[in-house]
């Protein structure tokens, strides 16, 4: 369910079509995207836009009730992991709900992307900079 405005028409469209528990992926430049899943490619060059920039825009527009993250981010990208947890903490306060954080293996994560409504690819080039957002409702 949409809750704001975004300039990218593909992102705006996919968020407006999300129902409760539907999923949307924000990923780094290297995540394989299944052919069966809609790809919204925002990557311009390495690092542009960053994972956190794309995630910030998407979560400003989307009501989030849960997220799925690869367990490997804790060891291989701890700085981004901490930044991500801080972002989710602020998002919880802004939305007025608790966001469930689930961890899975990177292999399972990649399989789950096939079930998502779309995958939004950032220009991020750091390991495991990927998240599955599970849509909530605003009421």
From Swiss-Prot:
Provide the catalytic activity annotation: beta-D-ribopyranose = beta-D-ribofuranose
Recorded metabolic or biological pathway in which this protein acts? Carbohydrate metabolism; D-ribose degradation; D-ribose 5-phosphate from beta-D-ribopyranose: step 1/2
| One BP annotation, GO | D-ribose catabolic process
Q: Does the keyword RNA-binding apply?
A: no
SUPFAM superfamilies according to UniProt: RbsD-like
Q: Which InterPro entries does the UniProt record give? A: D-ribose_pyranase, RbsD-like_sf, RbsD_FucU
Provide any one GO MF term from the record: monosaccharide binding
Family label: Belongs to the RbsD / FucU family. RbsD subfamily.
Record-linked NCBIfam families: PRK11797.1 (NF008761)
Known HAMAP family for this protein?
Answer: D_rib_pyranase
- Mind telling me what this protein is named? D-ribose pyranase
What species does this protein belong to? Escherichia coli O127:H6 (strain E2348/69 / EPEC)
Gene this chain is encoded by: rbsD
């Amino acid at each position: 369910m949409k809750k704001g405005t975004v300039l990218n028409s593909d992102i705006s469209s996919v968020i407006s079509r999300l129902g409760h528990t539907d999923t949307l992926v924000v990923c780094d430049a290297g995540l394989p995207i299944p052919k069966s899943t809609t790809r919204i490619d925002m990557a311009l060059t390495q690092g542009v836009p960053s994972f956190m920039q794309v995630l910030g825009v998407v979560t400003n527009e989307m009501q989030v009730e849960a997220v799925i993250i690869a367990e490997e981010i804790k060891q291989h990208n701890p700085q981004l992991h901490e930044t991500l947890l801080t972002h989710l903490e602020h998002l919880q306060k802004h939305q007025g709900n608790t966001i469930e954080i689930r961890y899975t293996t990177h292999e399972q994560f990649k399989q789950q992307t096939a079930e998502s409504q779309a995958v939004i690819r950032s220009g991020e080039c750091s390991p495991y900079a990927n998240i599955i957002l599970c849509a909530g409702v605003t009421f």
